[in-house]
Amino acid sequence: AQTAVRDRVYKSNAWFAKYAAKAFEVEIARYFKIVEEEANQEELQQQMLRVNQLPSLQEILDLEKEKPGSADVILQSRDRFSQNLQQDKLHDYLQERLDRRLARLTTDPGAPKFASLFVLNPHGTITAVAYDDKSITSNSVGKNFCFRTYFHGGPRDLDREIRTPEIAPIQDSHLSAVFQSTTTKIWKVAFSAPIYQPSGDGGKRLVGIMAITVNLGDFASYRNQNQKNTFAVLIDGRPGIEQGTILNHPAFSSGLSQTMGGHEKHFRIEPEQLKNLQLETYQLYQDPIAQAPHGEDYRGDWIAAIEPVRLPGSPIDPETATNPLSELMIVVQENDRVTTEPLLQLGKELLKEGILAICVLSLITGGLWFFVARTMGKTPSGGDRPLEITATPGNSRPQSHDLTTMAATPDQQPDDRS
């Protein structure tokens, strides 16, 4: 019975995982559409052209190519660049675009939510950043981030010392690997797209990279997950050391740190457990969040089902994919104890009632046998029944006698004389 219940719960979770994956695919597509729309804004293209030509920005690029020891000079160049009027105009433009997007949340709680919007030049240097929280002061402007996946489009971040042209920028829209913001220290992902400006010969040239970031937990599909016993989790399915990383979990929204202690950077499903989750049968799954100091709500066994999320441009037919794991995966998990405890409790109650019924039946049966046996024991047998003498007319009442036939003695012989 317990296996049947778990199998039923698994099938329910598998259906929910498919539904959640489809909903998330739609949301991901919205983010891609937004970043492409922003990258295609003509005003942004013109602003990027003017900023790219600033001497202070070129000075930063030249200094970064020199040997170590020019850190103070680079800082001075970055300060000059960030104080430039043209750079301020680019920042104000990005802030206005971000505020306009975020304003939609007041009327539509399910609207896309952004943490920041920023642009990089073709060499990977951030030229302007706008945050949803305007009190945040960026320390990223003027720094090179071409090692990030949102710039080069690879599956993982590269060495921080790498520079163009050793690494080339993306040519199409891209979803980055999870990374930690150098300013806010919050884990997030970025949607990025190249900024092209049409050229006179009918072609186009790259003038920068547009990127929008989303804090893990701010995707509409996973906002306000208040259920502690059944919920969906987003994980990174891309091959490599980050495969299985938990990108979104209800625990993150309740204040749990997104990083683990020790050498681990973030919570991650182990490869063996990730492989088992792909089997089309119920699996007892252990939530990695349970390892956190305050992760007691997620300890124990869970019944989990997994479903891939197909990003725009990914193969529709699973047989055409080179890797069975998608870039993103949805895990729907349900607390095994909460699921099976009612069944176990019912079994205990039925066992108690069964034992009680047997005891009552035994008492009733024993009582009946005792009554019958006692009744049978009081009933006289035919040989012991007293002889009843019916009174003759001369007697005043009948008398009962127990007569015993005995041989008469000589003096008791009848007298013939009488």
Residue ranges of model-derived segments:
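Juxtamembrane extracytoplasmic/periplasmic/luminal helical "stalk" adjacent to the first N-terminal
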Residues: A1-N84, P109-A115, D172-H174, W187-V189, ...
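Membrane-interface helix-start motif
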Residues: A1-T3, S221-R223, D317-E319, D336-A357
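Short N-terminal helix-loop-first-beta-strand/juxtamembrane motif that initiates sensory/input modules
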Residues: R30-Q47, R104-D132, R160-T164, A168-S173, ...
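Intrinsic low-complexity, intrinsically disordered coil/linker regions enriched in small/polar
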Residues: I60, R160, R205, G217-L325, ...
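Extracytoplasmic/periplasmic sensor domains and loops in membrane signaling proteins
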Residues: R80-R100, K134-F179, L206, A251-R299
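Extracytoplasmic/periplasmic ligand-binding sensor regions of membrane-associated signaling proteins
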Residues: A103-F118, V129-Y222
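Cytosolic-side ends of inner-membrane transmembrane helices, especially those
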Residues: E353, A357-K378
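Cytoplasmic C-terminal tails of single-pass
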Residues: K378-S418
